[in-house]
Amino acid sequence: MHPYPTCTLVTPTYNWPQALELLLLSVTQQTVLPNEVIIADDGSRDDTRKLIQQFQETFPVPLIHVWHEDIKNRKPAIMNKAIAKAKYEYIVEIDGDIIMNRYFIEDHLTYAKEGQYLYGSRVNIQESLLPELFETKKTQFGFFSKGIKKRTRTL
């Protein structure tokens, strides 16, 4: 067993609960879970808060919602507030529209070293496929899955 560092996952969100839902579902499917997840909310409407509250009822780790009022784009400010609330030694930061591969957190923690910054690339999903993904709640994709653009970034 690998001695993983403790970990906080931080992600921003703003008025796109459908994308946040897929992100949170992908967290629940991780082979190694973060110790907590913090959502940095840049002033989203009430539907985002309600979605987070629904997930909090059954989420496998603490799910913390850090919100501030919507006064134009203040993503850096809300991210700083969210990171300040992190309780664990290692922070993984992802964008709010990311659907993580189930090994994402495990891979991050496997290669975590003090003084080292890890980053990765992402593939894009064709916009025309988003309604289907939001309907089916699909969160796992193969290299040849339909609608994946820039798939060679995964190599």
Question: What name fits each language-model region?
Answer:
Residues 25-34:
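Short, acidic, metal-binding catalytic loop of nucleotide-sugar glycosyltransferases
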Residues 69-86, 103:
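Glycine-rich, basic loop-to-helix element that forms the pyrophosphate-binding segment
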Residues 91:
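Short aromatic/hydrophobic "clamp" motif used to bind/position activated sugar donors
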